[in-house]
Amino acid sequence: MNDQKMSCWRKKSKKKNSEANQRQRWFQENGKVLLEDLIELCNGKSNPIKTFSAEEILQATDNFSESNLVIRFNFMYRGILQNRPVLIKRATWNYYKSDTLEKICRDIAVSSMVSGHKNFLKLLGCCLEFEHPVLVCEYAERIPFNTPNPEMLLPWRMRIKIAKEIAIAVSYLHTALSRTMIHTDIQPFNIFVDSNGTAKLSDFCLCIAIPEGETFVKVHADRVEGTLDYLEYNYAATGLITEYTDVFSFGVLLQNFFTRTYGVVDCCCSEDESLFEEFEDKQNVMNLRISDRISKFVEEGRIFDMLDPKMLESMGDDETEEHKIRRMKAVLMLSLRCTGHRGDVPKMMEVAKELKRIERWT
């Protein structure tokens, strides 16, 4: 081997060793934060989390090729890993306002806690060998929300089923774990449907655990995060997080899902502007206008005026117009209760039970 070839070989070897050392450092740093979060949330008694190597992830996504990008704003890729289709989530520092590593580890930790439930996007494992941990999840499709393609619009039966199953998932977060977990970002982009038509809730980066014996957590106004048009007023204005934070967001989701009065889906706000400031500046927030409009239409008996015609057609000719109105009014009245526009705000378990009842109506 001549001197030139030897020099080239040494450089490649040095670069390879440097990359391996860096990945090992990331693995240790990321693993430490993840372990701390698991201990905080469940005293370390969590399900085992499978880890994948960086090489496996890069091969599965073709080096994170844009052609495999499923959701651009939160960097979700499709891939093939160990002979099965998967979704691979790779966040970046500028996706979140702050604490990116902690948020990604929270996503992994909560996902591992709920993966046994069919209505959550199942975590298959993670990779800690990148600067930001990468999640590997079962493959599912995003729900076609507010699509301009009429062929992709979901029929009534599918919409009510998805709504019911997401309500069940949120109720599970609130009641079935060792500590009450508040999702804080229930919105369409975080909902998937698998090949069997089962709805899956995902993305727990902003999930907040309420301490044992407490019913709320309060964060500083500049720490309020989420999707603006789905934020509960109290949370946006004061930083107070309760179970009703999710109930409100779910109510807005129902309103957007069953009418053609769509809200605007915003990503997290810019680093130099808090959601509190953005909320305060936006005096007639979209979800308030939607709820008020729905309330007015219900009172005036004009429900059909705000419904998606394709969805109405999908309810079938065997149903009378009166029966269709009854079912839709029940859903919309439930949504208004969730947003505080009609009577007492229900808990998510009650919401799930009511949606089951509406689904069974014949």
UniProtKB/Swiss-Prot annotation:
Domain Protein kinase: 35-362
UniProt-recorded name of the protein: Serine/threonine-protein kinase ZRK4
GO CC terms: cytosol
One Gene Ontology biological process: cell surface receptor signaling pathway
Similarity comment: family membership: Belongs to the protein kinase superfamily. Ser/Thr protein kinase family. ZRK subfamily.
EC number, as in UniProt: 2.7.11.1
Disordered: annotated span: 1-23
Leader sequence residues: none
Gene: ZRK4
Database matches in Pfam families: PK_Tyr_Ser-Thr
Record-listed ATP binding positions: L41, C42, N43, G44, K45, S46, N47, P48, I49, K89
Keywords recorded for this protein, A-Z: ATP-binding, Kinase, Nucleotide-binding, Transferase
Catalytic activity as recorded in UniProt: L-seryl-[protein] + ATP = O-phospho-L-seryl-[protein] + ADP + H(+); L-threonyl-[protein] + ATP = O-phospho-L-threonyl-[protein] + ADP + H(+)
Broad class of enzyme this protein falls into: transferase
Domain of life: Eukaryota
Active site: D185 (proton acceptor)
GO terms, molecular function: ATP binding; protein serine kinase activity; protein serine/threonine kinase activity
Entry keyword annotation includes Endoplasmic reticulum: no
